[in-house]
UniProtKB/Swiss-Prot annotation:
Skewed-composition ranges (Polar residues): 43-54
Comp. bias (Basic and acidic residues): 678-694
Name the record gives this protein: Probable inactive lysine-specific demethylase JMJ19
Zinc finger (RING-type) residue numbers: 544-581
Annotated spans, Disordered: 35-59, 678-708
Effect of inactivating the gene: No visible phenotype under normal growth conditions.
Originating species: Arabidopsis thaliana
Xref: InterPro entries: JmjC_dom (IPR003347), JmjN (IPR003349), Znf_C5HC2 (IPR004198)
Domain named JmjC: residues: 293-454
Amino acid sequence: MGIEGVSTYLKSGNMDTISAPPGFVSQTSFVLRNVPRDKESPRSVSRQEQTTGFGTDDKDSCNMFLKSRPWIVHGHTIPSSEALRPKKTEVRRRRPLKVSETKVLEEAPVFNPTEEEFRDTLSYISSLRDRAEPYGICCVVPPPSWKPPCLLKEKQIWEASTFFPQVQLFGIQTENRKIKKEVDADSNDAASEGVQLCRVERGPGYTLKSFKNFADTYKKSHFGMKDEVLGSENSSPSLKPNELIVADIEKEYRQIVESPLIEIGVLYGNDLDTATFGSGFPLSAPSESSKYSSGWNLNSTAKLPGSLLSLEDCESVCVPRLSVGMCLSSQFWKSEKERLYSLCYLHVGAPRVWYSVAGCHRSKFKAAMKSFILEMSGEQPKKSHNPVMMMSPYQLSVEGIPVTRCVQHPGQYVIIFPGSYYSAFDCGFNCLEKANFAPLDWLPHGDIAVQVNQEMSKTSLISYDKLLFSAAREAVKCLKEYGLSKKNTACYTRWNDSCGTDGLFSNIIKSRIKLEKNRREFLISSLESQRMDKSYDAVNKRECCVCLGDLYLSAVNCSCSANRYSCLNHMRKLCACPCDRKSFLYRYTMDELNLLVEALEGKKLSSMFRWAGIDQKFCASPATTSSKPEEDKGKETDEVTPCNITRKDVAAGTKDQTRVKARSLADILNVKDGNNDAKETLESCSKKSNRPCDNDSSEANAPKKQKQ
């Protein structure tokens, strides 16, 4: 076509219809480079005119010609080699907020129980909840009579037990450095967002004796060398280690966190397993220490009657943990795993200063942490990577987040409430022991923790559903015994307050059953149903292969992978097999779960007996005694039994069991109180009938009354 053809085509007015020839459409954009114009003779033809047919002065026609080519990117030039290099994100250090030296945090409440109040651990803590939970933390000073022996001072532990502490390095050289945690990586730890980063490394081995010697020497040298390092102009009056008080050490801690001038390193022994290292409390109850076997002995706190952890056998939450600190060693911001309660006792040593943000301000705290890490590093914090950081509680207070301060001395307890974030630092060598527990009011917090873990695909340390239905088993048992004997026991009092039509525990069970019902109706209605075998989770708890959620109540399995399960929400992500090859596994039917609600509401004694029989026969918990005859014991099967058992068979059991039950109940039941409900249960359970026990007619019961 040539230059003349292009010019003719342009003059004809067909500029908008120009398109690339077939096969010449560019798949990528390219950039036109501006070429400098040299001085040329009038006769010479520019390179631009040779290639496009336009002169340098005909700019409008040239622009129209180029705009008809959609593969050309306009308004760009070829960048220089330096511009092509990837730019590093500019990281600016956050300018420390000017916190007034006179800024005072709100103090946590301190309680002094009497001998009588101190006797029942969980009841006393429950009485403090309304007053102390808004602070997130509180301190309990035991009565003068409570002086348990510190077994950590015994020679076999003090000089023989070895541990490997963390080396915490913070200061100028560690700013803006992200270091992953080498200890328990807890997504709930707020150590991932803060103002001052800290490096954590594994330290050498120490005994308590050698660690104390190192801690005392370090404390003397640190405050003795402070004036020499900072200079006489910037230094404060010289402080001797034996004259230091908590306020002096806290001032030094604030200096390190908010505006460090030197780099320092300290040691901190965190989360030492007392089952291996040794506990400060006596494990047994000899004659001289029998009075220290109460719930305030942290070896028995998790398993106290009324703590749901007594129904769980998980060492990671049931075994107390030991912490060994030194001057300026820090516990970084964190929240307890599964949002459990914590009870901390300071055995020996210097005081510890705690800072806490209550669970009601949890969202504000997390938002402030994210903004701090974004401003410091220029990138969003990742859920899986948690760098170790510290944040000044006084700066949090300036941001509008209420922070509580608590000073714990040796021989005192500190209670951390569910959902609270907390941090701490030590004023010198000390040994602190911590135990978790879960009273009934923890269940709403545990439910939230389960949902958060599933969203983050994180394994839960405990099975929430197992705890929930194990607690239901205990509640029905206590209510049933009271219905028979009319004896007001401590167990009945505890469960009677939370059960009933509008009780806390009853409402939690109803909510969980409603959620399970909706999932079964809308997600797995087309799958074949099978009841779980007792060997399903006899060894290990089952988890969803996608979200790692607990599968105690229901699960989905496929024939292509026998040991692979998923929750109902992630059924389609289990495998690529069609639905006809997948099976829905359940522990209880919906009718049986509705029967549990009736039993907890306490309206009918017959519902309690029927649920107890169902729960004993099909509960896969190893702690539950099997109701099978003796000849069936010892038989094991790896297959999941199909759902071919009807409700009448479940309620009936064997004839021998029915006769034994009838003889035992006949001696206990009162003729006037509750006799009708009990007889209805026994009579209906001895029949092969599909009718519920509470629908039996009065005519069928009349002749049996005459016989009795």
